[in-house]
A protein has these predicted regions:
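Signature of multi-pass transmembrane helix bundles
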Residues: 1-53, 159-292, 311, 384-409
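Short glycine/serine/threonine-biased micro-segments
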Residues: 11, 58, 67, 107, ...
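Hydrophobic alpha-helical segments, principally membrane-spanning helices and signal/leader peptides
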Residues: 38, 45, 94-96, 131-139, ...
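C-terminal transmembrane helix pair
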Residues: 113-114, 121-162, 166-196, 322-409
């Protein structure tokens, strides 16, 4: 599927560019597309360099966590749940503990920690893969849940709104939590249907129901706090958790007589191997996305949606927020730029800007996640991963629009 999708980006971009040249006389469109290709190739290297340092750091700390038995302990605690969701992964396998750490880091918005931990988890799952170039069911479930963007503290969205002068930067907090819950639930259900997982199993429910209650209680607590208190808590909790994880790994490692420095260096060496494998996949995906954006195809799609909504007689205010939704699966930086542009054009507290902020906080850069996570282990056949991830993305967008009409219309 990824092969056809990648080719499709170029074909759609070419058709769009030809239409603009032949019908509109815009001969400069081809120069813009070529420029975008080289710009994205440069960006791929820059992203890899940034990932290299982060990966080296966190793979070193994770090696200490493994030697100290932390990852093994997490795997045992969640073993009964993952035996039902990922039956091909043996009980107590290190991948299970790493997956747990990754979800925890994602939920707290700790992207710098989540990505390296996630890549380590994907490599651990790859050790169980009988066909190294084809994604396994466990790898697909892990990737789709990653791409569903479940975040409890969307600090960056608050920051963007504050920079643009919002009266209450955290106004979109609950809408984001509700919308991202939609995307995660749909992602899990879609994979469960395809892989025939039994989510109603008593053991699965024993984990999921208390987790949902804890999440609901946490959301209720945060919703009762003032904007200033919430922003302060977000910053303190994120940084404290990040540093706390590091100290936890080091102290438990020292207590277990692990040679923490030597172990850190040994684990950090793996960062280079992971990073160098990413570059071809990043170049391929980002260049295709860049061409699609530069061709104007996304703008054509937006105009078509606007006309369709008007023809149906529906409210069209949300359409002005769709640029963020349309580019988010392809590029986080482009979606961020679209969000800020929407805020500046319509006003930071306007309905389109509120929808765009909620979309930005409740969706993920699906194709980037796909390229990074599968690229790190050489997966070429993604099977149903793309379809399920995009379905979760769509659920997040529709959920964001619906929740914003509920809260703000």
């Amino acid at each position: 599927m990824l092969n056809g999708l990648w080719l499709g980006f170029f074909v759609v971009a070419a058709i769009s560019a030809l239409a603009q040249w032949l019908a509109g006389g815009n001969a400069g469109i081809f120069a813009a597309m070529v420029e975008s290709i080289f710009a994205m190739a440069k960006l791929s290297v820059e992203v890899m360099v940034l990932l290299f340092g982060t990966l080296t750091l966190w793979l070193g700390f994770l090696k200490i966590a493994e030697q100290a038995g932390i990852v093994e302990w997490l795997a045992k605690v969640l073993g009964p749940l993952f035996r039902r969701l990922m039956p091909e992964v043996p009980p107590g396998h290190p991948a299970l503990g790493l997956i747990t750490l990754n979800f925890a880091a994602n939920g707290l918005g700790l992207d710098n920690a989540a990505t390296p931990i996630g890549l380590k988890a994907m490599r651990a799952l790859q050790e169980l893969n009988p066909s190294p170039t084809t994604a396994t069911n466990a790898q697909i479930l892990f990737l789709v849940l990653n791409a569903s963007s479940l975040t409890l503290l969307p600090v960056t969205i608050f920051m963007y709104r504050a920079q643009q002068g919002a009266m209450d930067p955290t106004l979109v907090f609950l809408p984001i939590l509700l919308a991202t819950s939609c995307s995660t639930l749909v992602g899990l259900l879609s994979v469960a249907i395809v892989q025939r997982l039994r989510l109603w199993d008593p053991v699965v429910l024993a984990y999921l129901v208390p987790g949902a209650l804890l999440l609901g209680g946490f959301m209720a607590l945060l919703a009762s706090m003032s904007a200033a208190a919430l922003a302060s808590l977000s910053s303190i909790l994120g940084n404290l958790t990040l540093f706390g994880l590091i100290m936890l790994f080091l102290l438990i490692g020292a207590l277990k007589k692990v040679k923490v420095y030597e172990t850190f260096v040994e684990g950090a060496k793996e960062g280079f191997d992971v990073a160098k494998n990413l570059l071809p996949y990043l170049v391929a995906m980002l260049c295709a996305v860049g061409v699609l954006r530069a061709s104007g195809a996304l703008e054509f799609g937006l105009d078509g949606i606007r006309h369709t909504v008007e023809w149906l007689g529906w409210d069209t205010r949300f359409v002005d927020a769709l640029p963020t939704a349309l580019v988010k699966p392809f590029s986080g930086s482009a979606a961020r730029a679209m969000l800020i542009e929407t805020m500046q054009t319509h006003g930071v507290d306007s309905f389109p800007a509120l929808v765009a902020a909620t979309v930005q906080g409740s969706t993920e850069t699906t194709f980037y996640v796909l390229a990074v996570y599968f690229g790190a282990v050489g997966i070429q056949r993604t099977r149903h991963a793309v379809g399920c991830a995009l379905l979760a993305e769509l659920a997040g967008v529709l959920g964001a629009i619906g929740v914003c009409y509920w809260f703000f219309a």
